[in-house]
């Protein structure tokens, strides 16, 4: 059997020791490792990669002709040069620092203005947070309110329940200096502030 590993946002881990990729621990050549540059460069580049175990490369070579490669050769060569010159690693370090600051600002603001009704889940990495919110409004309503002030959120029905609505909060797209004010406004619009 084969295991497909999508190491989503592994480059953007902010705290603690990074968890090694399953593929790096694989001694049986049964893990196919997938990755993308969408979070670390920009989504429009649409360059992804796949690391195959040696035993599977031959099979892949036989069927490769059935698939159309849609990624620009010029973009691939530019990215290769970018990596070779060390610019990619430098950029990752800068992104990691910026997103870490944005994450901390988001967590602080949610704690300050959420009045115990907002809990952030999985706060160690990435470009977004999953929020669990105790509110009379459902996740779709909360996301619609967020959208009205330009904040991108997505409802997560699978982990919402009768007591909490779950949604993904994309803090990465908010300028660092605006996070506190935006979260404060959002909590007020969501009517999570204590009534006076």
What spans do the regions from the language model cover?
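Conserved PLP-binding active-site segment of the aspartate aminotransferase-like
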Residues: 52, 130-135, 153-190
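Conserved glycine-rich beta-strand-loop-beta hairpin in the small C-terminal domain of fold type I
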Residues: 97-107, 118-132, 144, 163
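Short, solvent-exposed loop/turn segments at secondary-structure junctions
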Residues: 9-10, 38-40, 54-57, 125-128, ...
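PLP-dependent aminotransferase class I/II
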Residues: 31-112, 120-121
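Active-site pre-lysine segment of PLP-dependent enzymes
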Residues: 9-40
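Hydrophobic "anchor" residues on beta-strands that sit immediately upstream
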Residues: 1-2, 32
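A generic "structured core" feature
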Residues: 2-4, 62, 79, 106-109, ...
């Amino acid at each position: 059997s084969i295991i497909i590993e999508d190491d989503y946002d592994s480059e953007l881990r902010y705290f603690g020791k990074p968890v090694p990729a399953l593929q790096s621990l694989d001694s049986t050549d049964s893990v196919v490792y997938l990755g993308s540059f969408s979070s670390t460069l920009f989504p429009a580049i649409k360059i992804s990669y796949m690391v195959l175990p040696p035993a599977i490369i031959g099979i892949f070579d036989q069927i490769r002709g059935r698939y159309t490669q849609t990624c620009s050769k010029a973009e691939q060569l530019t990215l290769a040069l970018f990596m070779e010159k060390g610019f990619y690693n430098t950029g990752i370090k800068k992104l990691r620092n910026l997103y870490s600051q944005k994450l901390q600002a988001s967590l602080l603001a949610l704690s300050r203005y959420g009045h115990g009704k907002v809990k952030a889940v999985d706060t160690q990495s990435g470009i977004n947070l999953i929020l669990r919110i105790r509110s009379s409004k459902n996740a779709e309503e909360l996301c619609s309110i967020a959208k009205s002030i330009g904040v991108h959120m997505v409802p997560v029905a699978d982990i919402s329940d009768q007591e909490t609505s779950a949604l993904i909060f994309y803090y990465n797209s908010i300028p660092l200096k605006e996070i506190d004010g935006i979260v404060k406004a959002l909590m007020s619009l969501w009517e999570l502030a204590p009534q006076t």
